[in-house]
Amino acid sequence: MSNRKYFGTDGIRGRVGDAPITPDFVLKLGWAAGKVLARHGSRKIIIGKDTRISGYMLESALEAGLAAAGLSALFTGPMPTPAVAYLTRTFRAEAGIVISASHNPFYDNGIKFFSIDGTKLPDAVEEAIEAEMEKEISCVDSAELGKASRIVDAAGRYIEFCKATFPNELSLSELKIVVDCANGATYHIAPNVLRELGANVIAIGCEPNGVNINAEVGATDVRALQARVLAEKADLGIAFDGDGDRVIMVDHEGNKVDGDQIMYIIAREGLRQGQLRGGAVGTLMSNMGLELALKQLGIPFARAKVGDRYVLEKMQEKGWRIGAENSGHVILLDKTTTGDGIVAGLQVLAAMARNHMSLHDLCSGMKMFPQILVNVRYTADSGDPLEHESVKAVTAEVEAALGSRGRVLLRKSGTEPLIRVMVEGEDEAQVTEFAHRIADAVKAV
């Protein structure tokens, strides 16, 4: 990626009220995006948001900027990120814009774009928008100003799309499901999808008030879901994050089922049904148990850098259709164009219904390896600890001891002066000792 001033790997994000997430910046961003996208001939942009209180302010600013550039805004209201990608495709809009900071707290927000085909904007278009941001705002003639309107049936359209990814011959009528919508964008979507497919649904995290998104609920904190699954004696629980592009599940015993396990279930079911094309893409953080379980099934596996953008790039490079991060981003290119928590969850439920198996039993073919992560802070003026001979020597010793049944990953944080030390292997006590041994070597530099 080139050096950019505003766009990161997942759009523009920050604390509301601090640059760049301010009304004046977002208005100019809307104008700049409008100027660039108008060159492609379309005059409409889909705008969706999650449930953060700042979404109202930011969508108004975006709409004003787009209108000044001559483009019309179609508002969806609170809507999952993948729903905006879907609606952008079906409306043939020039682009879709999502106002969300995903799994972050309510006081953060962000802006990300989808192109006409429901994928992330190409780098060249993002760069053109940044170049336009350096110019003074100008307004089109009054007769050419953009308008604003609402897509009144946006939720219903997306609910039907999600249901269409679940096999017609199957039903969820045997299942009692607790669904946790993180007080986020799936609150009025996911429970209805599951109920309409026949499930007995208990909904939590479905009372957004603008400031409670991701607050001790959702895919990043499943404790409330685990407790409710056990209390209700439910068959399973499903948690989404604030914008609905991640899913984490909980089995009937209260065990967390992460993105690695979800991908394993979906890939194995695809193999059984003769529908799996190629292999599966994980990340550097994917559990070694996933790699070994897929290998046992004869399914090729490749690792991408951490980030759903890089997972998708690796999938496209290899021509494969399934990819996931252990955090719960699951990308199924046969079904949709981006990570979609509801669609991924439905594929696991289809495997349960088709095989008459519990979520717990579907996971049993994959043994999760203990994965110990230690963060070590360092000072930038002491040089790169990863290049130090003592750190390299200790790392080599640990790798030799683990052999082919474990691995070591050392990487720098992209946002703080931290070295992340990850050691994975079959024996938890051993890998814990190894992780701290390497961390001590990093600290000593």
From Swiss-Prot:
Activated by phosphorylation. The active site is at residue 102. The keyword Isomerase applies. Binds 1 Mg(2+) ion per subunit. GO terms for biological process: carbohydrate metabolic process; peptidoglycan biosynthetic process; UDP-N-acetylglucosamine biosynthetic process. Keywords: Isomerase, Magnesium, Metal-binding, Phosphoprotein. Its cofactor is Mg(2+). The modification Phosphoserine is found at residue 102. One of its GO terms (cellular component) is cytosol. Its EC number is 5.4.2.10. One of its GO terms (molecular function) is phosphomannomutase activity. It is an enzyme of class 5 (isomerase). Pfam families: PGM_PMM_I (PF02878), PGM_PMM_II (PF02879), PGM_PMM_III (PF02880), PGM_PMM_IV (PF00408). PROSITE patterns: PGM_PMM. Belongs to the phosphohexose mutase family. Catalyzes the conversion of glucosamine-6-phosphate to glucosamine-1-phosphate. HAMAP family: GlmM_B. This is Phosphoglucosamine mutase. It comes from Escherichia coli O7:K1 (strain IAI39 / ExPEC). The lineage of its organism: Bacteria, Pseudomonadati, Pseudomonadota, Gammaproteobacteria, Enterobacterales.
